[in-house]
Amino acid sequence: MGIRHELDILLVSENLALKNVELLKGDSYGCTINIKVNQQKKLDFIIILRPDWTEVRNVKKINMVCNGVVIDTTLIKKSFYEEVYSSSVTVFQNTTVEFFSDTSKKYKEEYPIVNINTIKRYYEIKDSRMTCINFESPISDYDQVNYLKDYINISDDYYLYDACDDCIISSDHDDNDNADDDEEDDDEVNDIEDDYE
């Protein structure tokens, strides 16, 4: 059947969870996140790896690169069932954040690519590649209780969101606005793609 790790990435500062980021099969995991900002912004990440021990004895460390600069990831919990990392970075411009366990082009070409627009507060999966990536916004109560409360050194503002005002919506979300608004949103999606091509 092959190795099947599980990888989730919580973008805590945007109340967004990237779920099932792992490859469908293989001892490699990672993704590329293009983030659009219009001002200085602190991005807080929690990375949750649930290893598949059927065919491996050790798991690979998760590396993080932001606009070509290596960022430290801190291992904050390790058990038989999961490894949890945290990382924070402050950005001043549109940013590309990469998470990866392997630097080989063979694997990196299979990692998913997502775009997150923090200005308009929506996301899109640009290319899911060899994954079944999906999103949750807001971050689920389960993830908040298990990962945010004890494992991240950030303000209580992030813990247990009461409303969906802080949610990020999918770029294909139908909010029944007029066609002009839809065209404006489409332009924004194209803008974020243009910034990274």
From Swiss-Prot:
Keywords: Early protein. Residues 174-197 have a biased composition (Acidic residues). GO terms for biological process: viral process. The keyword DNA damage does not apply. Residues 172-197 are annotated as: Disordered. It comes from the Viruses. The keyword Membrane does not apply. Pfam families: Pox_C7_F8A (PF03287). Belongs to the poxviridae C7 protein family. This is Probable host range protein 2.
